[in-house]
Design a protein with these regions (language model features):
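Surface-exposed extracellular loop regions of Gram-negative outer-membrane beta-barrel proteins
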Residues: 316, 362-365, 464-512, 532-558, ...
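A beta-strand signature from Gram-negative outer-membrane beta-barrel systems
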Residues: 15-54
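Conserved C-terminal beta-signal and adjacent last beta-strands/turns
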Residues: 278-281, 285, 295-297, 305-306, ...
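Gram-negative outer-membrane beta-barrel transporters
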Residues: 532-534, 554-649
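Outer-membrane beta-barrel signature, preferentially recognizing the C-terminal barrel domain
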Residues: 186-205, 385, 389-398, 447, ...
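Single conserved hydrophobic/aromatic residue that forms the stacking wall/gate
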Residues: 2-7
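Transmembrane beta-barrel wall of Gram-negative outer-membrane proteins
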Residues: 70-171, 201-208, 215, 454-456
Length: 725
């Protein structure tokens, strides 16, 4: 699957429904015949292949989310068969999901006064309502020409629509004495988009391949075309403000700072407010991928094998945003009409704490119905600074590899190889001139580099049940497109600015892994491993507050940087087994668990003002992660309880440790159950519940108690029936 998220090189896994996936390949260690852009290993999503015999399956289900309080719809269908004496295989699938959801969110940023006292300088209450609709269609064909030659084709189309409304109350520029400007904002869209912000993401992938055998010599080839797009038509924001308000801010519990208006002040929309801004934007982002690869295998005596091949990947990505601000010609009449079309979003079930109440906002229907392009009602002006995030990027990665698999003895196998990747980049961004209020294209920038990536893997079969593996590999992590482009991305609604960095280098990783696996005679295994990674030039966002650019002061400034080098040490443990070793009657009960410990330290830290600071951990690297699953399987009944844990880790780095942002620890628990019966027609009833612990997305600033964001999504349940004919 080649579809990619706009602005990055991350595959869009949530765009593809789970029922369209046949298998998930996880590779902890990257071999020379795999793409090297995988410091932590690789994950490949394999869509459904054509079957060995006729297959007909249908799924129908529903679900419920406690925030949206609306039902979910899940539908799926699969048909597969073989034709012409089993020479031709066909599999077609379709999936549809409609999932209303939402979230309750509080966000804060913290500042330190000259007296050393800490206070909140930005305070937000947000409420989201989202409806996500997914449609997915896939087809797979294979043609067995003869015993030595086979052709395959796969195609998939995914369409994901997200309709989102957001209501936000913001105490902006909140000072230590409690003075602030109150901002009340509604995010909406036009009536043809349900009066909501529509984010339409479409991905398609078509792949043709062949497998051929010429005597002992084997080869395979693959050619693919992929296209991804993201459109946001008519995204609207209406924002009201009231200056010089006074608040009492209770910081006795820094996890939940709470502001209450002083006498004569308010944070509720009323006729004292004025229009801050009314905007509409169009966003269109497109990416195309062309790939071709060929692999050749030549066996030797004694089980040795030589494999070599080449691959070319050509990517193009364009981002285009158009942004307009509208001013009512009669602002008094506009404000009067706006205050007649409000909604109260206060909710006693607000999950961060019901003491936070979102309040009153302009209604989404009212915001969507505004005739903004009527010159007798509104003055229209294109906002040049918002166009500075547009870019065009081109990337070509040409690679070749050689891999030799050798049997040293009957029990020892060695794999050695070298991969060479040549990366060529060309990109054009935008610059914004505040004095002239114009945006212009930058000159096209070019960059190219070659990476030589050796690898060595060893496997020792101590006996049939005990295996020892060791490896050295070299991998890399390329910067995101949007990080490289010399552009300026300004979010006026949040007063934030992000600047690209064309000088970014790819992060390089030298990986050492050693593991031992013991397989039980009954189904199960226990394994232990250690690993070490030396990462050079890792990339992280540097954050600055109250940053001045082109004469404007922005609340938050972000720029990606090569921040230095890092060393990571870790251990991995896993255990999987049913309980039949205790008593045969317990064979139906089993346990699966994994645990990883990672110790990381940064060297040569080069952020301005923090050069060579010691004791810092690698961003994005939790010290502890664990997964556990307890299951029961018997007579068609399957029950599973799963738990996932990850400890906190640093996510973004600021001007000092006080401004560092951390992703807090998470505890997730899910449960699912199913019952299958029937022989010729198998019927399965299923039910599942996700996020049983109502785990929020939580960030904190500097110390654990200082909440930056706490966003709750609630528990989700699904149930339905699957029929296989």
């Amino acid at each position: 699957i080649a579809q990619c998220l706009v602005g990055s090189e991350m595959c869009i896994r949530d765009r593809i429904p789970a029922d369209m996936i046949q298998t998930i390949e996880v590779n902890k260690v990257v071999t020379p015949d795999m793409d090297a852009d995988a410091i932590g290993g690789s994950i490949n999503l394999i869509t459904k292949n054509s079957p060995y015999k006729r297959t007909i399956a249908a799924t129908a289900g529903t679900g419920y989310n406690w925030i949206s309080e609306k039902a979910q719809l899940n539908l799926g269908f699969t048909y597969g068969d073989r034709f012409f004496n089993d020479k031709l295989g066909l599999m077609i699938s379709a999936s549809y999901q409609n999932s209303p959801s939402g979230s309750y969110d509080t966000e804060f940023t913290w500042e330190q006064g000259e007296d050393g006292k800490t206070y909140v300088n930005d305070y937000q209450i947000r409420q989201y309502y989202v409806t996500r609709e997914r449609q997915s269609y896939s087809a797979a064909l294979d043609w067995d020409i003869n015993a030595n030659h086979k052709l395959t084709f796969k195609g998939i189309f995914n369409n994901r629509n997200d309709w989102e409304n957001r209501y936000r109350t913001n105490l902006k520029d909140l000072e230590a004495d409690g003075s602030a400007t109150v901002r009340i904002q509604t995010k909406a869209g036009t009536p043809d988009n349900r009066n909501a912000r529509l984010e339409r993401q479409r991905t398609m992938d078509f792949a043709l391949g062949g497998e051929h055998l010429f005597g002992p010599f084997a080869m395979d080839w693959h050619a693919s075309y992929a296209k991804a797009s993201e459109e946001r038509p008519n995204e609207r924001y209406i924002d009201f403000q009231l200056k010089k308000q006074k608040f009492n801010v209770d910081l006795s519990n820094e996890r939940q700072p709470f502001a209450t208006p002083k006498d004569g002040s308010t944070m509720t929309l009323n006729d004292k407010f004025s229009l801050k801004e009314l905007t509409e934007q169009q966003e269109d982002i497109k990416e195309q991928d062309l790939k071709f690869s060929a692999n050749f295998k030549l066996p030797f005596k004694n089980g040795n094998k030589l494999k070599f091949g080449a691959k070319v990947v050509r990517k193009t990505k364009d981002k285009e945003v158009d942004f307009y601000e509208y001013s009512p010609l009669n602002e008094d009449a506009f404000m009067e009409n706006s205050l007649k079309n409000t909604v109260d979003q206060s909710n006693k079930h607000f999950m961060p704490n019901n003491k936070y109440q979102a309040g009153i906002y302009a209604g989404k229907e009212y915001t969507g119905s505004l005739d903004l392009n009527n010159a007798s009602l509104f003055e229209k002006e294109q906002v040049q600074e918002e166009l500075a995030g547009n870019f065009e990027a081109r990337e070509t990665v040409s690679s070749g590899y050689v891999r030799f698999d050798q049997k040293i003895t009957d029990r020892v196998e060695l794999m050695s190889g070298l991969r060479i990747e040549n990366t060529n980049l060309a990109y054009t961004g935008r610059t914004y001139d505040a004095d002239e209020d114009i945006t212009s294209k930058t000159e096209r920038r070019h960059n190219s580099y070659i990476n030589f990536l050796p690898s060595l893997l060893m496997k020792w079969n101590v006996n049939e049940d005990f295996k020892v593996r060791g490896s050295f590999t070299q991998t890399l992590s390329r910067p995101k497109y949007s990080a490289l482009v010399p552009s300026v991305n300004i979010k006026r609604s949040d007063n934030e600015i992000t600047i690209g960095n064309p000088e970014l280098k790819p992060a390089m990783s030298y990986n050492f892994d050693l593991s031992a696996d013991y397989y039980f005679r009954s189904i199960g295994l226990v394994s232990a491993g250690v690993f070490y990674k030396k990462i050079d030039d890792f990339i992280v966002n540097q954050i600055s507050n109250n940053y001045e650019y082109q004469g404007n002061v922005y609340t938050r400034f972000t720029q990606p940087k090569n921040a230095g080098n890092a060393n990571l040490f870790g251990i991995e443990l896993s255990y999987q087994r049913d309980f039949s070793f205790i008593a045969p009657a317990l064979k139906c009960i089993g346990f699966y668990g994994t645990y990883t410990y990672t110790h990381s330290r940064i060297e040569d830290f080069n952020f301005e003002g923090r050069e060579n600071e010691e004791g810092l951990s690698m961003p994005g690297s939790p010290a502890h992660t664990a997964n556990a699953s307890l299951y029961f399987e018997k007579a068609g009944l399957n029950i599973r309880l799963s738990y996932n844990f990850a400890s906190e880790f640093i996510d973004e780095m600021g001007e000092s440790a006080f401004y560092d942002r951390y992703y807090d620890k998470v505890n997730y628990m899910d449960a699912n159950a199913s019952y299958t019966f029937g022989k010729k027609i198998k019927t399965t009833f299923y039910a599942e519940a996700n996020n049983l612990l109502n785990q929020p997305l939580r960030y904190y600033q500097g110390t654990k108690d200082r909440t930056m964001q706490a966003e709750y999504y609630g528990v989700k349940v699904n149930a339905g029936v699957k029929i296989n004919f």
